[in-house]
Amino acid sequence: SGESGAGKTESTKLLLQHIMNLCKGNSQLEQQILQVNPLLEAFGNAQTVMNDNSSRFGKYIQLHFQKNIVRGAKLSEYLLEKSRVVQQDTGERNFHIFYYMFAGLSLEEKQMYGLLDPSLYRYISGRFGTQDVAQRWKHKYQEVCNALDMVGFQEQEQVDMQAILAGVLSLGNVTFEPEESHGSVKVSEASRGWLKAAAVNMDVLSQLVFCVPCSPWSPSVSCCCSLCADARDSIAKVAYGRVFGWIVCKINELLAENVDPEVELREIGILDIFGFENFAVNRFEQLCINLANEQLQHFFNHHIFQLEQAAYKEEELPWETITFNNNEPILNLLLAKPLGLLSLLDEQSAFPQATDKMFVDKLNSSFKGNLHFQPGRGRVLGFSIIHYAGKVQYTAGGFLEKNRDTLPANVRGLFINSITPLLSFSLQDIAHRALTVLWLAGLLIFLCPRQHSLMVLMERMYSANPHFVRCIKPNSQKEPGVVDSQVVLLQLRYNGLLETIRIRRDGFSWRPSFEEFAER
């Protein structure tokens, strides 16, 4: 764990290499476990203002052992930041793979996928990079292709995957305009070429446009144009999310153990998940990320402080209780039922007429006087949470839509019959998952799938015997060889590391078994 850019992903890779070396790992499986990283980073990482190679998803790697030999592995992914596909803030980029494609595809391949100059695409903000950067991306693209071959993607599957990615970029340039004769909406004349490049049938998209429901409270044509644009972005996010999920499934097929089910396997799990984030603009995604960090910090506190000191008291050892920064009040603010922030968000998300402003008003009235909540100031629609790592101001625009995380039923139905098997399968799978989650809603802390997956992750963590690796970010400027003492000290404080050092120094850090003690 650690802040964004502290080195969690790099440490995870080093830890995997270390474990494989301890196993004297030279088998094909052990090498494959190490070689899937370029693929995951290309599709799941992006440049942010805090980190040039920031993981925009969390991953839990389970290594299965028989004696000292790795027999298999499984990868679980959490909270992929799909909204990055359609929007990035200043100084940030889309997922790496889009830039790698532009740098690595030949001219003939770009023509086949309908790709033009990268400066033309809205989803990558018309930004590319210098010649040196493009050359580095070209090399990365080749690494991705090699990894796809190694994982077992067939040639046609790779073509389908890149066609979807290219189609996503082209779809982002499709715009809508009023249809004067019918008082409805149509695809703008200027963007019909992008529609063709996205390989979307005009009649199909027309159905999409005409059956997107306009709000009865503001049934203007401009409102319908906006809703059509939202539906377009939803398609792009779902398509990309499914490509990523497909890659994870193929990796798991490759790494699955091939042993007798009755053979007992031991397990080491490595969790590499987002660090605490505080950007100039913080949205729903940052709230989910910071909630995950709050839960992991509570998990750390529970094992290091509460269980440790409880053991001393149980054995009646002389001990002066060490206080620590307990973040339970923050978790209660976010997770309490029925009046926690996320419960109120789920409640508002259930009403089609609810707005982000109504949600913020509800928060302001419910949490008035709460020490960890502050209403937004001025005209900004938002609020602030005083997290264990510091104060974060959230912009509330889009909270309800992102929490619903749904694709309009009409859009889903139209694309189930897509000519690309992957996309067709993806939307059928999404429809099935949505129904399952809704059926389980009464039993879950959260409504939407992304938060449900976080709950499952925490259940796994509490059933394990944990070891904590704290990654410390040396400076905030992404500079090599520079240590900012104040930045480091702040992290040591809010992570609880100073208290951890004290409890280890003053307590009983060596716990030998009786047999080990007798041998000494």
What are these regions (language model features)?
Residues E3:
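P-loop (Walker A) phosphate-binding loop of NTP-binding proteins
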Residues V70, Q87-V209:
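Helical/strand "switch-coupling" subdomains that flank nucleotide/phosphate-binding cores, especially
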Residues L14:
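Active-site signature of alpha/beta-hydrolase-fold catalytic machinery across serine-
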Residues S11:
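Hydrophobic positions on the alpha1 helix immediately C-terminal to the Walker A/P-loop
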Residues D160, E262-R266:
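Short basic/glycine-enriched coil/helix segment immediately N-terminal to the Walker B
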